[in-house]
Amino acid sequence: MTNSEQERWSRVKGRLRSTVGEDVYTSWFARMDLEAVQDESVHLSVPTRFLKSWIQAHYAERVLSAWQAEMPEVHRIDLSVRTAMRCATPAKEAPAAVEARRPERSDAKPVSDARAPVMTPVAASHDALGGSPLDPRLTFASFVVGRANTLAHAAARQVADGRRGDPVMFNPLYIHAGVGLGKTHLLQAVTWAGNAGGERKVLYLTAEKFMYGFVAALKSQTALAFKEALRGIDVLVIDDLQFLQGKSTQAEFCHTLNALIDAGRQVVIAADRPPSDLESLDDRVRSRLAGGLVVEMATLGEDLRLGILKSRVAAARAHHASFDVPEAVLDYLARSITHNGRDLEGAINRLLAHSKLNNQPVTLDMAEREVRDLVRPQEPKRIKIEDIQRVVARQYNVSRSDLLSSRRTANVVRPRQVAMYLAKTLTLRSLPEIGRRFGGRDHTTVLHAVRKIEALVGKDVALNDEVESLKRQLQD
């Protein structure tokens, strides 16, 4: 992909983000890659069939419109699934930083490489309980630990090191974070390490794979065998739970979750938001998920970003011994690329490709030129309703449980109304969702509170100052 194509793709992604909103973009478009631009066609790829089918069904016209705004001659968008590869065991040496990603093609031919581990494409008809594909690079050895992920790493390591029959400490272990912050890496590391001893059955499934497996079992009248096989697992690892759809599928997931936990089997789950924010899930499932250990992996700090960059350079050197990135370049990348770990890895891949293909050393000027589309303005902090409740409760000297209660005393009613007002103005949550998060209140109650505070801040200077102070505390 040329620099001009990279810049166009960056602008198209910006249009999509502004059109559909940050939450929708993160859920459905963040993992979409540009593969090629040919004449009147644009070739894009996503990692799963589920993402492909959902985008084609719901967002095809918007994607085409975003491209036509950039290139009016484009009349066709081809969306494919990046080929998933399965490896028998993770590579023992440092994992390769550069790996070709190609969309699925009927005419694709295998490429032999004596240094690479033997891999076989995962067949579409593979049994659901064969698990989702594992990336041999995603092990504990290649995971970079920092302040943002220390607790998540420690909890995942504790699960991986357990033995059959050991008491289960955290069940379920629920890890949530934004795109590219290491959730999938940790879950696959648990799976690799847990299966290494051969004592336990550790199964890694994406939510999409669970859904398709359950639906296929229903159609083939093998649902009972599907349930029994799942409940015979020692450690069940589920990734991208936010994509779990359908009442019957969610009900089966809830039954499986309960059966495994009640039997003392470990469940590990990852999603892009906390259980309370998974609005599409049944209340029983959210409650069960929240009953375990819920861990957030925070945004990567600069020190952690620098550690990830150094790790990726070391991995690249395993296959390209002469590859070198000066400290000044690493410092620049760590300061400038703040979005997620995938962008950091992509930056190293670009520098490696440019250095090798042009036979040039990596310099700061080259880095600034090659990664400029990855350097984004600092995004505003994402504020959560729990943060609002905590800060408001502290400001007005009440408890969070008071805000959620049915108490109608003056010292509770006003803080509750302020908190609802802030939830409406500082988050993207709907009125019904805000009401549910404030003790199961009706959306009309929330609307009344919002209008009440809106009217008061215009004429009550003291209240306006309090609200502005709360906003600053939440945004800092």
Curated annotation (Swiss-Prot):
Q: Where is this region: Disordered?
A: 92-115
**Record field: compositional bias (Basic and acidic residues):** 99-112
Q: Where is this region: Domain I, interacts with DnaA modulators?
A: 1-73
A GO CC term assigned to this protein in UniProt: plasma membrane
Residue sites binding ATP per the record: G180, G182, K183, T184
Q: Where is this region: Domain IV, binds dsDNA?
A: 356-476
Question: Which segments carry the region annotation Domain III, AAA+ region?
Answer: 133-355
Alphabetical GO biological process terms: DNA replication initiation; regulation of DNA replication
What's the domain remark here?
Domain I is involved in oligomerization and binding regulators, domain II is flexibile and of varying length in different bacteria, domain III forms the AAA+ region, while domain IV binds dsDNA.
Q: What is this protein called?
A: Chromosomal replication initiator protein DnaA
Q: Which organism is it from?
A: Bradyrhizobium sp. (strain ORS 278)
